[in-house]
């Protein structure tokens, strides 16, 4: 459609997600090119075997990042939500713009919840015995909306899902519009399970998905379900801190994380996260209440 047009300037957003062949086309059409993206968030989605993935996993943006400018002021997150990603991923350099540094749900007319009184809140499920399961073998087809005996390898956690659904209903009972809330599940099977539990809320505008679907997006409030809970400390691709950085930076005014510190706590990234929520006294236990809606 643009023929042989060459533009004075080409701006490519989310450039860290673009593999080289995709970037070469716009780069060839600009006298000057500006690449914008975050190398600490999701890279390109590449399929086709180990050789193809290894070839395309490193992007032009990654190779140019040493000659870049970091935008240190962010205009999305409350400072309590921002501080951990800033420390863990950006060397503590992020700064909250004055207009967002202290904004909270109450500014939107949402009733306060004294039991979750901070902009960031952790519900720790350690010791609840809400153990994860795999969907490799799903005899009822109940989690993936597929025929019985379907093969759909992913991880889900029914205990977590029930708690996350309760937390979502509690938030909505305070007057938060469903369109202002998102639930991000670490695994696709868990997202499907949550969609089943929250059908009515989804019909009203609540969004439920995985990390990949929320790159570059934001919501006033976000619940993140990290799903994994086992006796061996296995965390799978939760060890990919770039993915977790995306999940933890989508919320503007309120972020609630549901996680098992006993399973995740040996990984340095999560150990630092649990230390931070303890430092700011922003945590509760799944043992303490059932997250009933507020009257």
Language model features: what each stretch is:
Residues 1-295:
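Conserved helicase motor core of SF1/SF2 NTP-dependent helicases
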């Amino acid at each position: 459609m643009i023929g042989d047009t060459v533009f004075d300037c080409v701006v490519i957003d989310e450039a860290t997600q673009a593999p080289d062949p995709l970037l070469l086309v716009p780069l060839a059409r600009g006298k000057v090119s500006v690449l914008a993206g975050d190398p600490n968030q999701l890279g390109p989605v590449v399929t086709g075997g180990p050789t193809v993935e290894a070839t395309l996993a490193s992007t032009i943006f990654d190779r140019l990042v040493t000659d870049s400018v970091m935008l240190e002021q962010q205009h999305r997150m409350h400072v309590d939500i921002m501080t951990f990603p800033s420390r863990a991923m950006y060397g503590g350099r992020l700064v909250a713009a004055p207009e967002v540094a202290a904004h909270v749900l109450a500014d939107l007319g949402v009733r306060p919840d004294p039991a979750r009184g901070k902009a960031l809140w952790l519900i720790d499920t350690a010791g609840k015995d809400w153990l994860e399961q795999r969907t490799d073998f799903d005899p009822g087809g109940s989690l993936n909306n597929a025929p019985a005996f379907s093969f759909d390898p992913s991880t889900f956690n029914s205990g977590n899902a029930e708690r996350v659904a309760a937390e979502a209903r509690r938030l909505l009972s305070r007057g938060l519009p469903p369109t202002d809330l998102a639930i991000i599940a670490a695994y696709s099977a868990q997202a499907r399970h949550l969609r089943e539990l929250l059908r009515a809320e989804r019909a009203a505008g609540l969004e439920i998905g995985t990390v990949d679907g929320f790159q570059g997006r934001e919501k006033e409030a976000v619940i993140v379900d990290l799903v994994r809970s086992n006796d061996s400390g296995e965390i799978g691709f939760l060890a990919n801190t770039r993915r977790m950085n995306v999940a933890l930076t989508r919320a503007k005014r309120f972020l609630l994380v549901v996680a098992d510190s006993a399973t995740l706590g040996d990984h340095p990234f999560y150990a630092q996260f649990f230390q931070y929520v303890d430092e700011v006294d922003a945590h509760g236990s799944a043992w303490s209440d059932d997250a009933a809606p507020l009257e």
